[in-house]
Amino acid sequence: AQRNAALPVNQGGLGLAPDNTAMDRARAMGFDVDNPVYHGTNADIESFNTSGKGKTKGAGAFFSDSPIIPETYISGNQGGNIIPAFVKDDTLAVFDAKGANWNDIPVDSLSFKRKKASDLLGLEKGDYTSTDELASYAKDKGFGGVKIKNLKDRGANSDINRAKEYLKEKYGITPN
C-alpha cells in the first residue's frame, strides 16, 4: 500500500512521499483523520456491516465522536470492542438534534443546508424520528450517511471508566 500510494495520481497512486504512513494515505483518500469516531460491538469484526441487522437493518454502521457512547452498546460480560475509525464527511447529511434523545428527535427541528429534513428526506412535519430512521432515509436519498450533532444516546450499560481504560490499554487513546 505504501509503495502504490507513492505513485503519481495519473498512475493510480496518491502522489505521496515514498515514506508515507497509513494516516497519510487515509488523509489523501479523504478520511477525516483529525477527528476519530468510535464504534462499539460485542463481536470481533474485520469490517463494518453497513447493511445492518434487526431494527437497524438498512441504517448502516453507527459511530460516535465520543468513545463513551459506543461503550454503552457493549455487554460487559461478553467482552466487546470499541473500535476507533475515520469517516469521510463529504457525503454526509449533517443534522443538529438540539439535545433530543436518539429515538425521539422532532422532525421540525432538523435542517440541512437550509432545507427542512421533512422536505429533504420526505419525513412528516410535526412527527418524531430516530437515528435509525434518519440514516435509512438519508441512504435512500443518496447520502453516504448522517452526522447528528447534539444528540443524547447513552444506554443502560454505560461505564465511562471502563471505556476509558479499554481505549488506553488497547489503543493508547486517552479520551476527555
Language-model segments: which ranges?
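Active-site and NAD+-binding cores of ADP-ribose-processing enzymes
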Residues: 1-176
